[in-house]
Amino acid sequence: MATPYVPVPMPIGNSASSFTTNRNQRSSSFGSVSTSSNSSKGQLEDSNMGNFKQTSVPDQMDNTSSVCSSPLIRTKFTGAASSIEYSTRPRETEEQNPETVNWEDRPSTPTILGYEVMEERAKFTVYKILVKKTPEESWVVFRRYTDFSRLNDKLKEMFPGFRLALPPKRWFKDNYNADFLEDRQLGLQAFLQNLVAHKDIANCLAVREFLCLDDPPGPFDSLEESRVFCETLEETNYRLQKELLEKQKEMESLKKQLSEKQLHIDTLENRIRTLSLEPEESLDVSETEGEQILKVESSALEVDQDVLDEESRADNEPCLHFSEPENAISEIEVAEVAYDAEED
């Protein structure tokens, strides 16, 4: 048989003044007294063997006015034959005179953050409840279903005409089924909403002890509370590291895009520079070709001039040559004739 569960609360955003009370005499709800850290160590020390499951719960902590105007909540439990209704409507007198209600006299709706299955000696489930007294002061307490049941019994004795409709027990099926635990968590959340929806119930001693309203726990009151505080820091560290990794991936992607854009810009600049240099090169080529054409034309003119000079010289020279041979022949003939005449 498991010993009574000792709650292990953890503050979130506590002010310095909340640590001044004497915490050595703080008692848990309904007879479970925390005498030392060793008494609860056996129940929560091996929490890593359990399976802690966080489920999404609507955040109703900051809007206290929604408690009075919230509709009827209907929850159907796994294996149950009928649905159970959880009413969050305020008392009739408060509905008639809403302006006279002092919202500071009651806490905001506690939120069940999740549950954890403990398997140290006897297997059981604890529910992690976030209690927010003010926007600046909040803490976490751990409660078993047995603690909720004891609170419901006490409230029945104190308020006989009021029924909070606690989710029923489950006798012959697996109490650690995930679907069943989620349904029970929803029912317990509606139960807590009913607690704070009525001023008299929210301010009674049983509820204040259940939520530790008069003696908010500190993060280092016991070994278990320190463990929960360290786990919260680890979760925060993991979340921040995950965000940092995502930012680094995004930065690497942006760097890659930037390098691609820069390469594209360099390519365009080189292309523009090439296009701007092509007209100058064509102009240089045309000038060179023009000079070569001029040189060729001048050379051709020189050649033509030489040819004309040679032709003119050739026209003058044949007259002289033809006249001289005629004279020579006549002389030869005269000489031959004269010689022959002498021989005769």
Swiss-Prot record:
Residues 223-278 form a coiled coil. GO terms for molecular function: phosphatidylinositol binding. The PX domain mediates interaction with membranes enriched in phosphatidylinositol 3-phosphate. Its main location: membrane. It comes from the Eukaryota. Belongs to the sorting nexin family. One of its GO terms (cellular component) is late endosome membrane. InterPro entries: PX_dom (IPR001683), PX_dom_sf (IPR036871), SNX16_PX (IPR037911), SortingNexin/PXDomain-PKLike (IPR051837). GO terms for biological process: early endosome to late endosome transport; endosome to lysosome transport; protein targeting to lysosome. Pfam families: PX (PF00787). SUPFAM superfamilies: PX domain (SSF64268). Residues 1-66, 83-107 are annotated as: Disordered. It is a peripheral membrane protein. This is Sorting nexin-16. The keyword Protein transport applies. Keywords: Coiled coil, Cytoplasm, Endosome, Lipid-binding, Lysosome, Membrane, Phosphoprotein, Protein transport, Transport. Residues 1-10 have a biased composition (Pro residues). Residues 105-218 form the PX domain. Signal peptide: none annotated. It comes from Pongo abelii (Sumatran orangutan).
